[in-house]
C-alpha cells in the first residue's frame, strides 16, 4: 500500500498532470479527466490498455464510457485519497491516450 500523497508530493507530482487537463475533484481527494477519441473502437482500445496495467497494479480507475468519450477518476480507496499509484496510473493513461489517437 502506498501512503497518501503529502503536500510536497502533491506539488511535485500533480502539477504535470493538471497541465495536461487533470482536475482535482471537488469534495474528494481524487483527480478526474475526460478523454475524447476518434470513435468507439479507439476509446475501447484505450480502455483495454489501461485495464491491463490497472489489473497488474491492482489499482482500478472509476470510469464511464459513452461512444468516443471516456471519463476517468482516480483515487486510492485504501488511503482515502491520492497516492503514488494514482500518479503512476494517470501518467500511463496520458501515454495510452496519445497512442489511441484522441481527437
Curated annotation (Swiss-Prot):
Keywords: Lyase, Tetrahydrobiopterin biosynthesis. Transmembrane segments: none annotated. InterPro entries: PCD_sf, Pterin_deHydtase. GO terms for molecular function: 4-alpha-hydroxytetrahydrobiopterin dehydratase activity. The keyword Zinc does not apply. One of its GO terms (biological process) is tetrahydrobiopterin biosynthetic process. Pfam families: Pterin_4a. Its EC number is 4.2.1.96. It catalyses: (4aS,6R)-4a-hydroxy-L-erythro-5,6,7,8-tetrahydrobiopterin = (6R)-L-erythro-6,7-dihydrobiopterin + H2O. HAMAP family: Pterin_4_alpha. Belongs to the pterin-4-alpha-carbinolamine dehydratase family. PANTHER family: PTERIN-4-ALPHA-CARBINOLAMINE DEHYDRATASE. Involved in tetrahydrobiopterin biosynthesis. This is Probable pterin-4-alpha-carbinolamine dehydratase. It comes from Hypsibius exemplaris.
Amino acid at each position: 500500500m502506498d501512503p497518501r500523497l503529502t503536500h510536497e508530493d502533491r506539488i511535485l507530482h500533480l502539477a504535470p498532470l493538471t497541465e495536461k487537463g487533470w482536475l482535482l475533484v471537488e469534495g474528494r481527494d481524487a483527480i478526474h479527466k475526460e478523454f475524447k477519441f476518434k470513435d468507439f473502437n479507439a476509446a475501447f482500445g484505450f480502455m483495454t490498455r489501461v485495464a491491463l496495467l490497472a489489473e497488474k497494479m491492482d489499482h482500478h480507475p472509476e470510469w464511464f464510457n459513452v461512444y468516443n468519450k471516456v471519463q476517468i477518476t482516480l483515487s486510492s480507496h485504501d488511503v482515502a485519497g491520492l497516492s503514488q499509484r494514482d500518479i503512476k496510473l494517470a501518467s500511463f493513461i496520458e501515454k495510452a491516450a496519445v497512442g489511441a489517437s484522441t481527437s
